[in-house]
Amino acid sequence: MNDYRPLTTEEIEVLKHNDCWAEDWTSVNVSEDFKPNFMHRVMLYGEINIGSFNKNVEVSQGFVKHSGINNATLRNVTIGDDCLIENVGNFINNYTIGDDCYISNISTMETTEGATYGEGNLVSVLNEVGEGNVILFSDLNSQLAAFMVKHFPDKEMKEKIRQLIKTDIDNKMPDRGQIGNNVKIINTKEITNCVINDYCEVNGASRLSDCTLLGSVHGNVYIGTGVITENSIIAEGASVINSVKIQDCFVGEACQLANGFTASASVFFANSYMSNGEACAAFCGPFTASHHKSSLLIGGMFSFYNAGSATNFSNHAYKMGPMHWGILERGSKTASGAYLLMPATLGSFSVCFGKLMHHPNTRNLPFAYLIADGDKMFLIPGRNITTVGLYRDIKKWPKRDLRAMENRKSIVNFDWLSPYSVGEILKGKKILENLREVTGDNVSQYLYHEYIIPASSLHKGIKYYDIALRIYMGAVLKRVLKRDPAITPPASHVGVGDWDDLSGLLLPVSEEEGIVRDVKEGTIENIEQLLDRFEEINANYRDYQWAWTYQMICDYYGISDITLEDANRIHEDYIKARRSWIAEIRKDAEKEFAMGDVEEEVFRNFVDSLDQEIEYEN
């Protein structure tokens, strides 16, 4: 910040000549090289500090104006160097503005008593009428948010986390609103109690109230026409445009909200895209997408999710209130017109069709199709493993991560086959085998939690699950062999056992329990240490995965150790399974091409990409 000095008598006279006025000229201080001739028709109240006016400011492509202040009323404002502030219809009150900013054609910008800037806001996701289970603050990421949602029912844990976050917020809380460097704010009506970081742009917004925009040189925030944001935080690289209205929300890195989308008490992380529709009490983890006006995401936890048009969830039984909620695990989709009656839990990479009743819980039958046909509910386990859609999804997500490397607070593990999803597959395969054993082979259908599994679908489900298991084991072993041809057993048992998915972070449950223990015992003393712990676990993912997979391979093949001979057999099984997988996907593509409206070039390009999969076998 500049060292400011009082105005000289000559400077005051120039300012008066330019129709400027001050309540008290002795309360106006300026930088050493201040030039008064670049201020016109400015009213000054309270304590004012003004920087230099040495540069031009680009107001539109190829159109520059000299920095200065014109047609504005300022009260208790500090302005950095080389800003252009003009045509302020009402006033700027209680604000600190950085260097090289362009602020034009705004109505009001002020900080009032009790400003929070959106920090520390406690919202209730999933359970719409809950007591609050996510605290919004600038350093929030998808892992910490998911951790809070999962563990806040533990009152001791909730209080510990709240205290850590409160300390973090108190240490960073400014005494008044802040505008960073290189910020552009134009054609905007009202900005109240906001912190707007470096390189952000606000263009045509209606109202920003108690918000923080976390822009940086690596990822600016853009707020567009007609937008209203209240009590919210918007992270680096995010854009909120075209009359979006959000309340009590966190918008994460590189998220896009557009075209009249509305949301309340919801969180969005890492490349999520929301357009036209609505969200309420929704936890939208990495790569959650909803494009359609008629779609409502309510009371659900999602990640790597795509909502078809007219998707709806029922969180209200019209008895005790809108308190029901559900989880659609990573990779799930809902087709056009899909409806899901909460509470419900869908396994990884599931696809929903129609009006699904009976509160399905298919966590241990992942990659399933759930289909409503009138009042009959069908479950097709493992079907999604061999679809074009899954193949395209797992290829596209890593390419669509728009976050700068410096702005990746949320951890995103893209593995579609992992100890988490493969653990579900193992349980699913056993469930199907048990159903077949108990009911027998001479039936046309099986029943699982009021969902019908056609006999042919059960048999194919076992087959598809086994294909996925062999692909997974072979892929992990192939990676290990490249760095360790001797196939050394894991040095630690950490990773053996159940796994969890904390909204993008795949981790052993034992490690998550360790975090819970350390937070309660005070070993984790601040938010930075907690976030670092998630990063540390992610950095050890391959070691944990190897410990889990080594045990899984031994169990699957009935061996006690993995020899090179075993490795050759596993690799052969891997190649066969992978080729079967690709062949099934090719059939799925051919079936769609036969419908007649897929361009041949598109089909051929896709088939060519399948042909290239053989390159990844060794």
Write out the residue ranges for each language-model feature.
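Phosphate-/polyanion-interacting regions in eukaryotic proteins
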Residues: 68-80, 84-159, 186, 532, ...
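Intrinsically disordered, low-structural-confidence terminal and linker regions
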Residues: 1-9
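Polar low-complexity intrinsically disordered regions
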Residues: 1-2, 163, 172, 199, ...
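A charged, amphipathic alpha-helical module
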Residues: 163-180, 185
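Core alpha-helical transmembrane segments of integral membrane proteins
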Residues: 179, 183, 187-202, 210-221, ...
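Long, compositionally biased intrinsically disordered regions
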Residues: 373-618
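Glycine-rich hexapeptide-repeat left-handed beta-helix
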Residues: 9-10, 14-24, 30-53, 57-69, ...
